[in-house]
Structures are given as C-alpha cells and as structure tokens.
Amino acid sequence: MRKAFYTWLMAQRNSTSNKPAALLADLVFEDTTFPKHTDDFETISRYLEEEASFSFNLGQFDQIWEDYLSH
C-alpha cells in the first residue's frame, strides 16, 4: 500500500524553495482540515478545488501528483 499523499508531501517541505511541491507542502501543513490519511486523487483534488482555505494552481498539483505516484 502506498503511503498517504500528505505523508509524502510533508517530506517535500522546504521553506526556502520555490518548487511547487514545497509551496503546496507548506500550505497543506497549515491547513488543519486537509485529508491526511488518503492516497486517493479524487478526494485530494476535490478538497483543493472546493474546500481548501488556500488557493493553489491545480495544473501544478497534477504534476506533483505524478511525482508522488513515481515514488
């Protein structure tokens, strides 16, 4: 079983980086309602589109998701 997206994303945190994964990781870290225990694309994508307390380029999210799947 693949580790949760949140767990993988937290390993990408880097406050000095401008990489999209690092930026998203910092935003998600501050969001207490982010779905932390799932590896389901639809659940996370829907959350980012409809419920997140921040905005993020979903085109960049798609690339981050591909990186997640390749690890």
From Swiss-Prot:
Belongs to the UPF0346 family. It comes from the Bacteria. HAMAP family: UPF0346. This is UPF0346 protein SZO_05010. It comes from Streptococcus equi subsp. zooepidemicus (strain H70).
